[in-house]
Amino acid sequence: RKGYNMTMMKPELLSPAGSMDSLKAAVNSGCDAVYLGGKKFGARAYAGNFDLQELEEVCDYCHLRGVKVYVTVNTVYKDEELKEFLTYIKELYEMGVDALIMQDAGAAKLVREHFPDFPLHASTQMTCNSLADVKYWESQGFNKIVLSRELSTEEIKHITENVEAEI
């Protein structure tokens, strides 16, 4: 993506979805992708997140309409949850989730080792606020990075002009 000024990319319209109704509204309103949480390993544990069966329905509904599905996996797992964590990631991978939004470097390393072609997006919780931060996460296999909200337009421009990852 270096040389960003030469080849402008169309921005992706990404919408949150906390329920099937909000998901359908977002998709029917023209979003390019949705992000949502599952019942496991998501930071919004008490939100109306989707169970595995619902996530499969979400993937089918969205993919039939050309919309991508990103699932947040943005909590830290415990040692005793490792097997459950990897099983959950495998289920998401097999149902066709388009990418995982992650905030834990160790969890991302595990995903990369077990599912090397599963796209990873760096969550805003990773606090990426410099070119060095973005380059680091890019080197760790993240292909999309959500920057810190504190950055100025000029700082964002500088970063996007100097990395391959999507911002």
Task: Identify the meaning behind each predicted range.
Residues N5-I167:
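Non-catalytic helical/linker scaffolds that mediate oligomerization, partner binding
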